[in-house]
Every structure is written in structure tokens, then in C-alpha cells.
């Protein structure tokens, strides 16, 4: 596998698709530096079709810094730093409105590494920026012109 990652912006302001990395194996220092700078520049990055274990996900996350153990959600077996979000008809999401993660602690996490194991055929949209903030401003300040 090449040392060089392919980074393709998904829009003018946020998001990039990254290929050329195999997250089932540790990234080289050079590859991690490319990934790190892509996260800083694009804020949200996608590394698709990565069949990683919770242990491999934790190892990657640890390269970014200290990890947080969530006090409420269930953890992956043997990996306390990884939470499992399992939603379906009998277990609907409890946070499907706008929210930020773990902002109630003194030093909130700088980010999150998500590994989807099963996705719905529709829905599940993650929105950020103005698409989220406009409706939130309207609900907080109904008399303002947002």
C-alpha cells in the first residue's frame, strides 16, 4: 500500500473522502500526519469500507490524543473507550435532534471516530454548520430574523 493518501474534498467548506489507507493495520507516521492534517483542514473525513475492530478503532483514536470513556452509553466489549449506538424500530434514537456530544465535561472531546457496522437504507443524515444552526437559532430566538 502506498504511503500517499488520496484526499478528495467533498465540498468547498467541509468534508473529504480519503482512500489509500488500511485501518486494519497501523498507519505509518507519514500516513497519520496526512490524515491528521486532512481532519484539521476538512473537519469531517470519510474512510469508507474499513472493516475495523473496536480495538483497531481505539488504536487509531489514541494517536489523536487522550480518549474519553462515556459515562452513559454501553461500551464495546473489552473496549471502554468505544460506545455502541444500536438503534432500530424497538430501540429508536434518543438524540435525533440537534446536539453536541459530551459537552457537559470540563474538557470535551475534540472529535469522534465513527465506525458504522450497519446502516439504514435511508435517513441517518448528519448535518453540520448553517443547515443545523438556522433552525436552532429560530427555536431559541423566535422573534429574531435568523
Feature locations, PLM:
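Non-heme Fe(II) oxygenase catalytic core, chiefly the N-lobe of the double-stranded beta-helix
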Residues: 2-146
Amino acid at each position: 500500500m502506498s504511503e500517499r493518501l488520496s484526499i478528495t474534498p467533498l465540498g468547498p467548506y467541509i468534508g473529504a473522502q480519503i482512500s489509500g489507507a488500511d485501518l486494519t493495520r497501523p498507519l505509518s507516521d507519514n500516513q497519520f500526519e496526512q490524515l491528521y492534517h486532512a481532519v484539521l483542514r476538512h473537519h469531517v473525513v470519510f474512510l469508507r469500507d474499513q472493516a475495523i475492530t473496536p480495538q483497531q478503532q481505539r488504536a487509531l483514536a489514541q494517536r489523536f490524543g487522550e480518549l474519553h470513556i462515556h459515562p452513559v452509553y454501553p461500551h464495546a466489549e473489552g473496549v471502554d473507550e468505544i460506545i455502541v449506538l444500536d438503534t432500530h424500530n424497538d430501540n429508536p434514537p434518543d438524540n435525533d435532534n440537534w446536539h453536541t456530544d459530551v459537552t457537559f465535561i470540563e474538557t470535551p472531546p475534540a472529535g469522534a471516530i465513527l465506525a458504522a457496522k450497519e446502516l439504514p437504507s435511508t435517513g441517518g443524515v448528519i448535518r453540520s454548520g448553517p443547515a443545523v444552526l438556522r433552525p436552532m437559532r429560530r427555536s431559541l430566538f423566535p422573534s429574531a430574523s435568523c
